[in-house]
């Protein structure tokens, strides 16, 4: 008994246990733990407030209420310790035992434990092979169950209704068979669980053998699955040594009374824990049942009482899981034992994972513009309170006081000595500042406190970005690290000066913003005709002197001699160069410094000069920036919003164009969808043009002054318009916002996300009219509503990510992986979105990288690719690089240093023990929240680019076609007839410069081998609809196109013209199609294949030709409208990221080809079309290896007869299904796809995240394997196992000469992956607590406490960073200063003698 409680006491040595096991408690075990039986439902006597004997608070069972004092008062004080009072039976001991002693209730009848009964799948039901419904009938006394059929025809476990049971008794006699109802019956069945025939053995192991045998014989898949499910439960019992009958409770433990307290309120009432009510209910019903049984009451009454007891115990363990929720007097559901653990307010998340911290305070923050980067201003009153113990200690040490009490008085009086001592205590003692919400690790940083008057904490302005803090009333919390170790960690790891780079992307996060940027930008700008323009100076010092004397203006253009060269620059830039480290060249700042340039400057300084210089530079830049922003005296006036003169003309032109399109629509040339899209494009275009005009007018001005010859002259120069300056420098605002102030607001979106086609032509300076204002409110309101919802969503995403990745820790130096991934530049639509250099920076090379021309080794295998190496690789023209990656790391637990590469926040290789999983989760989750909050800043102005409908090349060169098949029209234009064709532009040497995919139906404007200039149009197509094009000339013949059945003639209300569109038909065999016939009426064949020229029409296609029309090759016969574009917002973004990480199957996912091959169409079946893909082997088609795919009729198939497809290519329109990609293309391809998809969402928002973070999460999602063939291993078919467990088991079997199991990789979503982790503590504190614990208890799981979360919950140091096991056993040798001094003296003496 004592042992179990040592577990709850604070372990003296944190290593007192290394693993934790959970299993079922047997009735004997419960009695062994217990200190006595609770027999009465009474709690305490309301008059004396003493606990009632044998009641729920009984002192005899649970211990004394007051320390060392028995209940009746006979024994008091320490001297009687350990005595048991003979009068009241209470042991004289500390009262805290009331927190740890258990009692028990012996039940009059066994009851089922609701977790094992109702938690799906029902464990008791599974084991007995009875459905849950039947089981409940038995337990809640509604039916009898046969326990032992003996000689009768009944089956064991068969249900009998009351009538049937009575009949059977009459028929067979009383002793012919045994049947029962209620808990006893089920207990009997559980005790007798075993195989049907004796050949397999006895009991549970026998049952397992029998099921195994059945599984081998089972033919149908469903049956196999069912047996496997049951076998899993049975195996768990075999392995864990739990007995099935322990799932029924005969004894219930009663938790210690101080954990379910009863507190007297004033007014004679009591506040009580709900558990007491639940226990009272159980005891009452139990006692009543005992009494009824002693009285031999009628069966029906006893049965009812048993049912009620079962219900009471159910409510105690998990209220509301079955039947009505039991409520207290105030109609509130009572909190049961399960509810104590579950959810955000449960034990796990409220008290174990998040605790309140002593030695902490919070206050409003204000800016501290003169602090150094490593400092924060701490209010004196606050510091006095936080550092009290230290002050008391120092006061005693210095002899000001002798006792703690007098020290306390002295501090309360705030005597002058106290302040001096406070200064001393605080020196070199860092404090932690935290701003909620803490979204990434930079939300808590350490600073050295500086004492200040006032009550607000002062925060350094440069760390605001990391905290996402502003000074509009934000509050921050202060925490004091107490122990020397904690202070060390705060100083070395968490000091703000050690966190210059962001862990998410490795660029500086301590970056000047707002006013500072404004000031530096202002001082590095050049102004025409400024005082002292054109002067020549011999040194920067002279410039400074001239500026101080007022001889030259800050923005005057001057010549200065720098490092022996004459440089053209401005006064401001020379002054700026004064504060920059000397290792940086003057070129690096001799330009207009905006926010981007400043970030680059900080980055460069960090790389070249190291951390210390960077910190000094940051502080100097801050001071200089604030100073110059003040001197600049920038303000905003109405006249600064310049409305472009051309605006009126542009609007008139747009209105005319819109009218034209309306006319075309009225004549029936275009569809309603095309009209809408075109109108929206016109307005989007005009808004852009107005904005450009406005930026042109705001951004430049004419300066007038006297030239060298004294004549008046004019010069154009970038404007000094304050609004323009703010946006251009990156200090505040964006072109997007200025456009709304002075251009036109443009298109707005409805709440549904569609764009309203009438734009707001006014801007805020002109003011909006009522209608425009009303349209605006849509967007603004949606923005606010979104924000509220998204913040919660994003927080939840982060929580799931952290949970899945919490045990990804760097555990070893090199795992010896021979495999890696290949990275190149990220290209989209012919544009390089992310150059290769950025993607490979800080990674480790897999193989030697050779220069393609000279053959020299540029980077050795397993060497880190740093900035210098990236330059080498780029200059050598290498475009694909093999690097090591987290995805291919072979470390058994965790990840190795080499596969991870650079620690982005430190700029060097990662340390062993770094919790890279959590960092990855935070890096992905943090911008999620930021983005969600960022929706409404533009006020819902619809930003959407005109659809791309052309291809232009960027470089001059030669045209090459790759896999492009064309149809030539009569007029000689070429129309592209297949999907995955590409146009390649090569240079003279034939090296590929750019590559563009061409859309089906595009018109080619160039020929193979043609020379093209830069920016020439190569191809164009209709962006609003996808055409269906005929490849042969002939006459159109409709097939299955029946009006009102498969097509509908829609008469457009506005134009009065009819249009034919294909609709979904009720007839499953109808196949709407268009065939092309020749003169004789035979269907024509397609060129170079023997397939017929028949075109199936998907739902929604608009017919362009009529029955009997003559068509030419390359003509459009039908159009598929593309969806009207919605605005892209992270709204699409956050759910998209979540669905990618959850690995959800998209609703209408595309069918993809599993092999390379040639497309043909087979016979249609059941309203589905059959696509057959035949592989080529040695350039011969092999129909025997062909794969067939059925695609629903309404879907648009994007391949055509004779197309060559690659494995993994989509055969129809639709979203890709990650599980298919994994199955067909393998893990690496899937990982690449996931990384690209996630990155795309963030890139749209301009958020940078390093690929390796996403890879880390994907690695955690791919940890498992599904067993396909068990071989001779212990696994079950279809079981999911960890990859490494799978490999180990296979090695073991192969060594023994058996057959290894076969598995296929499995992609789990992050929630599933978190719940299937090895650690049950971690999984249960994440979600579905009861389910996880139920499963763990049955299989007697052992948690080896390897992850971070389990250790936090158990109250131990986390096994990462400084908490790594390796650091716990270090021997530290301390050299005493005395020895050192003596040694030094000796050395000096010897030196003197010599």
Swiss-Prot record:
Any Pfam family matching the protein: RNA_pol_Rpb1_2
Enzyme class of the recorded protein, top EC level: transferase
Ligand binding (Zn(2+) 1): 70, 72, 85, 88
Coiled-coil regions listed: none
Keywords of this entry: DNA-directed RNA polymerase, Magnesium, Metal-binding, Nucleotidyltransferase, Transcription, Transferase, Zinc
Reaction(s) catalysed (UniProt annotation): RNA(n) + a ribonucleoside 5'-triphosphate = RNA(n+1) + diphosphate
Domain of life: Bacteria
Bound cofactor: record note: Binds 1 Mg(2+) ion per subunit.
Biological role stated in the UniProt entry: DNA-dependent RNA polymerase catalyzes the transcription of DNA into RNA using the four ribonucleoside triphosphates as substrates.
Protein name: DNA-directed RNA polymerase subunit beta'
Biological source species: Anaeromyxobacter sp. (strain K)
Underlying gene: rpoC
């Amino acid at each position: 008994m004592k042992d179990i409680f040592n577990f709850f006491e604070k372990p003296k040595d944190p290593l007192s246990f290394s693993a934790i096991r959970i299993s079922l408690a047997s009735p004997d075990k419960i009695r062994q733990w217990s200190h006595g039986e609770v027999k009465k439902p009474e709690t305490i006597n309301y008059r004396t407030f003493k606990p009632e004997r044998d009641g729920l608070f009984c002192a005899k069972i649970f211990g004394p209420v007051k320390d060392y004092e028995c209940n009746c008062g006979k024994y008091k004080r320490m001297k009687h310790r350990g005595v048991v009072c003979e009068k009241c039976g209470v042991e004289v001991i500390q009262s805290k035992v009331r927190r740890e002693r258990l009692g028990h209730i012996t039940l009059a009848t066994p009851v089922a434990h609701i977790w094992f009964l109702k938690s799906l799948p029902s464990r008791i039901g599974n084991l007995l092979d009875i459905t849950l419904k039947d089981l409940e009938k038995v337990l809640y006394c509604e039916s009898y169950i046969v326990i032992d059929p003996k000689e009768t025809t009944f089956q064991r476990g068969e249900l009998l209704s009351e009538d049937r049971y009575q009949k059977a008794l009459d028929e067979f006699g009383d002793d012919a068979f045994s049947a029962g109802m209620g808990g006893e019956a089920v207990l009997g069945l559980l005790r007798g669980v075993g195989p049907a025939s004796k050949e397999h053995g006895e009991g549970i192991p026998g049952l397992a053998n029998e099921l195994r045998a059945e599984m081998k014989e089972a033919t149908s898949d469903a049956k196999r699955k069912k047996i496997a499910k049951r076998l899993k439960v049975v195996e768990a019992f075999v392995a864990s040594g739990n007995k099935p009958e322990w799932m029924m409770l005969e004894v219930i433990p009663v938790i210690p009374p101080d954990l379910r307290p009863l507190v007297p309120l004033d007014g004679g009432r009591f506040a009580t824990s709900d558990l007491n009510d639940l226990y009272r209910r159980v005891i009452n019903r139990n006692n009543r049942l005992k009494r009824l049984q002693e009285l031999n009451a009628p069966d029906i009454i006893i049965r009812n009482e048993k049912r009620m007891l079962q219900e009471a115990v159910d409510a105690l363990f998990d209220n509301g899981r079955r039947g009505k929720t039991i409520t207290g007097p105030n109609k509130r559901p009572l909190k049961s034992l399960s509810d104590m653990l579950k959810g955000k307010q449960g034990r796990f998340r409220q008290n174990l994972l998040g605790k309140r911290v002593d030695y902490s305070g919070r206050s409003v923050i204000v800016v501290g513009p003169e602090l150094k980067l490593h400092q924060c201003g701490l209010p004196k009153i606050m510091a006095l309170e936080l550092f009290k113990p230290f002050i008391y200690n120092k006061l005693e040490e210095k002899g000001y006081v002798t006792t703690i009490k007098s020290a306390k008085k002295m501090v309360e009086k705030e005597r002058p000595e106290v302040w001096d001592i406070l200064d001393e205590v605080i020196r070199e003692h860092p404090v932690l500042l935290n701003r909620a919400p803490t979204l990434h690790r930079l939300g808590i940083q350490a600073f050295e406190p500086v004492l200040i008057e006032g009550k607000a904490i002062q925060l350094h302005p440069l760390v605001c970005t990391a905290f996402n803090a502003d000074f509009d009333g934000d509050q921050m919390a202060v925490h004091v690290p107490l122990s020397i170790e904690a202070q060390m960690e705060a100083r070395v790891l968490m000091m703000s000066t050690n966190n210059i780079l962001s862990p998410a992307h490795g660029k500086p996060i301590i970056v000047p913003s707002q006013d500072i940027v404004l000031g530096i930008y202002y001082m590095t700008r050049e102004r025409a005709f400024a005082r002292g323009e054109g002067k020549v100076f011999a040194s920067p010092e002279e410039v400074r002197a001239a500026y101080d004397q007022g001889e030259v203006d800050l923005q005057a253009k001057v010549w200065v001699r720098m490092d022996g060269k004459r440089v053209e620059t401005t006064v401001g830039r020379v002054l700026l160069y004064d504060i920059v480290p000397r290792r940086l060249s003057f070129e690096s700042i001799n330009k207009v410094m905006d926010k981007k340039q400043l970030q680059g400057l900080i980055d460069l300084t960090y790389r070249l000069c190291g951390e210390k210089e960077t910190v000094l530079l940051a502080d100097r830049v801050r001071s200089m920036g604030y100073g110059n922003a003040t001197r600049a005296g920038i303000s905003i006036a109405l006249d600064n919003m310049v409305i472009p003169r051309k605006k009126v003309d542009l609007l008139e032109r747009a209105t005319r164009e819109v009218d034209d399109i309306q006319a075309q629509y009225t004549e029936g040339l275009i569809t309603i969808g095309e009209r809408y899209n075109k109108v929206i494009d016109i307005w989007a275009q005009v808004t852009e043009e107005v904005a450009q005009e406005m930026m042109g007018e705001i951004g430049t001005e004419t300066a007038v002054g006297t030239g060298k010859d004294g004549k008046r002259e004019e010069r154009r120069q970038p404007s000094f318009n304050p609004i323009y300056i703010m946006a251009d420098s990156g200090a505040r605002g964006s072109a997007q916002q200025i456009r709304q102030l002075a251009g036109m607001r443009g298109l707005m979106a409805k709440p549904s996300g569609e764009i309203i086609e009438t734009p707001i032509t006014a801007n805020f300076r002109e003011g909006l009219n009522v209608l425009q204002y009303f349209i605006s409110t849509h967007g603004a309101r949606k923005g606010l509503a979104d924000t509220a919802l998204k913040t919660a969503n994003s927080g939840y995403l982060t929580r799931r990510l952290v949970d899945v990745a919490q045990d990804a820790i760097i555990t070893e130096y090199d795992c010896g992986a021979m495999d890696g991934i290949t990275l190149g530049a990220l290209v989209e639509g012919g544009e390089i979105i992310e150059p290769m250099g950025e993607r490979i920076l800080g990674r480790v090379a897999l193989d030697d990288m050779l220069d393609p021309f000279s053959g020299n080794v540029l980077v050795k295998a397993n060497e880190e690719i740093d900035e210098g190496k990236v330059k080498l690789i780029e200059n050598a023209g290498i475009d694909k690089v093999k690097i090591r990656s987290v995805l291919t790391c072979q470390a058994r637990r965790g990840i190795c240093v080499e596969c991870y590469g650079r620690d982005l926040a430190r700029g060097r290789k990662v340390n062993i023990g770094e919790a890279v999983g959590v960092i990855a989760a935070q890096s992905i989750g943090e911008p999620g929240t930021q983005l969600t909050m960022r929706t409404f800043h533009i006020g819902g102005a619809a930003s959407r680019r005109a659809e791309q409908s052309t291809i232009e090349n960027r470089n001059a060169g030669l045209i090459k076609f790759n896999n492009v098949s064309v149809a030539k029209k009569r007029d000689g234009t070429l129309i592209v007839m297949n999907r995955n064709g590409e146009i390649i532009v090569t240079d003279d040497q034939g090296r590929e410069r750019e590559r563009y995919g061409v859309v089906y139906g595009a018109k080619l404007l160039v020929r193979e081998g043609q020379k093209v200039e830069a920016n020439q149009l190569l191809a164009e197509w209709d962006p609003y609809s996808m055409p269906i094009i005929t490849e042969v000339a002939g006459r159109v013949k409709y097939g299955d196109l029946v009006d009102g059945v498969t097509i509908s003639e829609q008469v457009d209300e506005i134009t009065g013209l009819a249009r034919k569109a294909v609709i979904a038909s009720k007839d499953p065999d109808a196949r709407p199609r268009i065939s092309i016939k020749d003169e004789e009426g035979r269907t024509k064949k397609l060129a170079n294949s023997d397939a017929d020229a028949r075109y199936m029409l998907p739902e929604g296609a608009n017919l362009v030709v009529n029955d009997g029309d003559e068509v030419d090759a390359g003509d459009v016969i039908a159009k598929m409208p593309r969806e009207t574009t919605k605005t892209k917002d992270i709204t699409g973004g956050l759910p998209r990221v979540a669905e990618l990480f959850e690995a959800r199957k998209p609703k209408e996912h595309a069918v993809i080809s599993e092999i390379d091959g040639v497309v043909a169409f087979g016979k249609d079946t059941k309203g589905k079309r059959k696509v057959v893909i035949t592989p080529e082997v040695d350039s011969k088609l092999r129909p025997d290896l062909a794969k067939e795919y059925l695609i629903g009729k309404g879907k648009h198939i994007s391949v055509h007869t004779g197309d060559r497809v690659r494995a993994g290519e989509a055969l129809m329109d639709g979203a890709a299904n990650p599980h298919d990609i994994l199955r067909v293309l393998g893990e690496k391809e899937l990982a690449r796809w996931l990384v690209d998809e996630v990155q795309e969402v963030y890139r749209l928002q301009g958020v940078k995240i390093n690929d390796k973070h996403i890879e880390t999460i994907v690695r955690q999602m791919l940890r498992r394997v599904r067993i396909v063939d068990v071989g001779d291993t212990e696994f079950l078919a279809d079981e999911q196992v960890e990859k490494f467990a799978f490999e180990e088991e296979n090695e073991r079997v192969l060594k023994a000469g058996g057959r290894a199991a076969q598995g296929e990789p499995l992609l789990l979503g992050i929630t599933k992956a978190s719940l299937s982790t090895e650690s049950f503590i971690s999984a249960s504190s994440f979600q579905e607590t009861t389910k996880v614990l139920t499963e763990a208890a049955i299989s007697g799981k052992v948690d080896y406490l390897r992850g971070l979360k389990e250790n936090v919950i158990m109250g131990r140091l986390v096994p990462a960073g400084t908490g790594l096991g390796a650091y716990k056993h270090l021997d530290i040798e301390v050299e005493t200063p005395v020895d050192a001094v003596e040694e030094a003296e000796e050395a000096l003496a010897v030196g003197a003698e010599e």
